[in-house]
Amino acid sequence: MACLSEGVSPSPISRIHRMATGLASVILLLATAHAAASGPSSTSQEKSTPKPCVAPEIDFGGNDLQGLDAYGAALEDLLKAEKFKELNCIADLQRSGKERFPGGMWKLHEYYWGITKLHGHPTHEDWEDRLKLAQRWVDATPESITARVVLAELYTGYAWDARGNDTSDSVTDSGWKLLSQRMEKAKTLLDQASALPAKCPEWYFAMQQVALGQGWDVARAEELLKRAVAFEPDYYYYYRQHAFYLMPQWNGEDGDASRFALQSADRIGGEAGDLLYFQIGAKIVCACDRPEFTRFSWPRLQKGYALLEKKYGVSVAQLNLVASMAVKFQDWAAADNAFQRIGDNCDKGTWMTETYFNQMKEVATQMGAQAARSNAILQEAATNLQSAGGAQYQKSVEQALLPFMRQCASSNNDRVQFELVVKVGKDGGAEDAWFRQPTAMAQCMMRAIYDSRVKKETPFPVPPRLDYWLDLHLDPASVSVAAAN
């Protein structure tokens, strides 16, 4: 399936995967504006007595995906009503409070997303109307860092809109020209904003979008990342955006993005590192042909998600990401578990189409029970190996398999290592077996073991207990080594 939103050109203002919000009816925003020291947004606010920021009550209705859309819509309504002071006040509050939604998403980042995201298929007039509103915001509150970052992110989105989502060789000369002009406009706005007394974590993220659009060299992009992380270490979007910048279709080579995720997570270390590893992976996974994601460690991604849910709470949007990751790694037990928790709440930002979501959900349902049984057997085999005498018994079974391997090696040239799971019965016969990699040698070994069972042979030593499972990692090269010995 083609990745419609990220496979060729990203929409840097867009958050690829929606994160969680509350599930109950909540007051979206009701707080007191902070004094100038916490991030002033306009001269008038600095000189006057702080007033409360009031926004309409939002009913999240039990679905965090819908709740997040409602959150963005409420902010968009304030923009259209030209409630610029209220918008500045809300942003100041979220900057200073560093609050997050369930699932770990920063409210500040969602604030910018809600205002700058144009839904559906926006026309040239739609972009121009939104840009004019943002420009009036800048004009009305010239000291607002928020207004300038919003306007800059709108220009980066408008720039990618001109380029389109096709491959680079299909972009018109006009498209390239508009991309360049609008990215330069965004950079100019951000440069101007950097001189303001108030600072904002989103400024660096917006500049990373410019870096991607203008094709900055790696050294320059890394320096920007370094400055961003120094300003706000926990604003994980910086790491995500840089990983995307390192994707092969942009400025990196195969393996660069996954290597960056690993190095970043290891440098931070501990649970925080594992959590960041998942957050970066969530940016790279896509319902498309993107091999880079499969270079990530699935066990570490799972660990990171578990920590994220424990720390920030459950999010249907996050569960959509976990299900997508599990599908990529063909861990159908994990996928089935995630789909059951998701229900019918498909996040199209993750799956691109509801049809694909339903297809994968059905596959996971069919394969999940079988995968869960397989996982339980593998765990039992691991326990057997660690038990008293387990390692010695497994070695004896591997030795007993050498004649089978020698027979198979004589009929094919496959020398790839493979994994074979075997259940040994009480008398030393093979009662069950399957391979985990469909190599030629593995398939030949399965036929040989099956023939042995049909003949009621007992090629293995009597196991320590009944129905004894082993997870065998076999190397065809051991056949020649054994022969030499």
Stretches found by the model and what they are:
Residues 1-17:
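N-terminal secretory signal peptides that target proteins for export/translocation
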